[in-house]
Amino acid sequence: SDFKNKLVISDFKYHCTFILGKDKVIKSVNVFELILFGIYKLSIFIPLFLIFIRLLATNILNFLFEVFKSIYSILKILFVVRFKPIRTHFLRPLSVSFIMISNNILLLISSLWYWLRVGKNLLLSTVGDGVGRFCKFRLPKPLLIDLVWNFLLFCFLCDRNFFIEFI
């Protein structure tokens, strides 16, 4: 019940001793060997992390480009419709502007959806094949996964420390 792992610095020669419970010494290891072992273990995940960051950055740039393009188009249409004097056929330019605004909004939603789908598929492939198969075949519309992924991306963009603590 009172067996707890403890890490104790034994001397100033960069050695640490693992003590389990009631002062039972398990192993005294070199700190540098411990760091190298940790780097070796983490090096397995570095390629996956780099692929994830590259894909995320590419999709963020594409998504931001689509966002700015859509906002620019919407503002341009609204500015032209509002301040340009329309003498005849008022409904026609208004309907055209409405169609263009709705098309831009749909383009924005579709780019966001594509971004979420790519991130979700990457997340499922990194988590594991079993989870991916479960989410692909057991859930007909994995909207919950998309919402969770959107939340995680939002936390990552706003506060990376919260994202790391959440993971």
Swiss-Prot record:
It is found in: Mitochondrion. One of its GO terms (cellular component) is mitochondrion. Keywords: Mitochondrion, Plasmid. The keyword Mitochondrion applies. It comes from the Eukaryota. Its main location: mitochondrion. This is Uncharacterized mitochondrial protein ORF2.
